A protein has these predicted regions:
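Polar, enzyme-active/binding microenvironments
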Residues: 1-100
């Protein structure tokens, strides 16, 4: 699955959509993020879980929240914890064992 979350359309949204990468087609509703935000600090994933952190609410500044969801089933984001500082538009990376 490919997953898309948050954004601005025309207001900040909390929508999570997904596509099945093996087939052509439109995005389908996956669930909702824990809050509406945009410009998240990237994402990282394992084979089973996707994690995103940071971002912006409107109109407030950057946030420090981290949330995750499981690829196998559709559903809403779940609180994972907090970043050490509020930030947005950063980068993250991961391998099969952990993320930075």
């Amino acid at each position: 699955r490919g997953v898309f979350a948050g954004g601005w359309s025309p207001n900040v949204v909390n929508i999570i959509d997904y596509i099945t990468t093996a087939t052509l087609g439109n995005a389908v509703d996956f669930g909702d993020m824990t809050e509406a935000k945009y410009s998240m600090s990237g994402s990282m994933s394992s084979k089973t879980r996707m994690v995103i952190g940071g971002g912006h609410r409107n109109p407030s500044p950057a946030v420090n929240t981290i949330e995750y969801w499981e690829f196998a089933t559709t559903g809403n984001g779940t609180d994972f914890g907090d970043l050490s500082a509020a930030k947005s538009s950063g980068g993250q990376c991961s391998n099969a064992h952990g993320g930075l």
